[in-house]
């Protein structure tokens, strides 16, 4: 039995889907009371779409921000062999208090819960590449505390949460850490439940005519942006989570060959069928304008927090991930090979949300 947090969120749901299809695993999914009906509907879809899935996913009302995960008195800890901790606040503009409550205290509560499980084999923790903050250079999978500064409270609280996980690992907790970079839709279908990252640029381009204006922050030939499709992240996690050699490891689920900002923008302009007119702007001026001019952030559709990633100084080493996935056929596809799919999905599905499920 596995206990999973972050249901019915996109990555958690898709992770369950793959394990139901590929293994005989069964799940307890921790669900906030306000999402109970949504979770039950999602479970019904899983059972209807996957042969043999009926009864293998059971919801339990709880909350990672509460001691003991808010589980009912007398909840049995027997038989839970793995914990999959997906739940987090992913919002670049999140307030510190909420980020700390969910990302740090929530993770602490999950770790305390896992420590009390008599049958635990592994805890699988979903972190982020951006625990790197604004580290200048190549950030290794073994790196964490490098004196970095952070763009926002999402990054800083995920950093603190990973510190907690690593401390428990040193004390003997069997755990695996996964660090996705910026996750976009499925490379084959474009499907996603949340638009952020490059989708802000796609949306901005599609709102304009054939000649589109786009602010240029910094040197677009100098900085890269690391994008990974959700199917790569999930396929990698499912495979790595079943390899005993993964215990104790950290895997950066990032594109090993990321494009520069300039190349990404050119690819998106091509796929949106727009010719670009780029206007150089200092990043700090752009952030000030978005913050200071009433309504500008909403009109642009680009959160001020996203602007930092147009001039992000960090590259991500993926050596351990590539070594562990060698021979499995699981590889990160080239962004240019699926970017058109992302654009078409967004055009056909304009109502997908851009806010986190909290």
Give the location of each predicted region:
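Mid/C-terminal beta-alpha module of Rossmann-like enzyme folds, strongest
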Residues: 239-302, 323, 343-358
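Conserved Rossmann-fold NAD(P)-dependent oxidoreductase catalytic core, especially the SDR/UDP-sugar
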Residues: 85-86, 93, 97-101, 105-153, ...
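A hydrophobic C-terminal alpha-helical subdomain
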Residues: 204-221, 283-330
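N-terminal Rossmann NAD(P)H-binding glycine-rich loop of SDR-like oxidoreductase domains
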Residues: 1-24
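NAD(P)-dependent short-chain dehydrogenase/reductase
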Residues: 137-138, 168-225, 230-235, 268
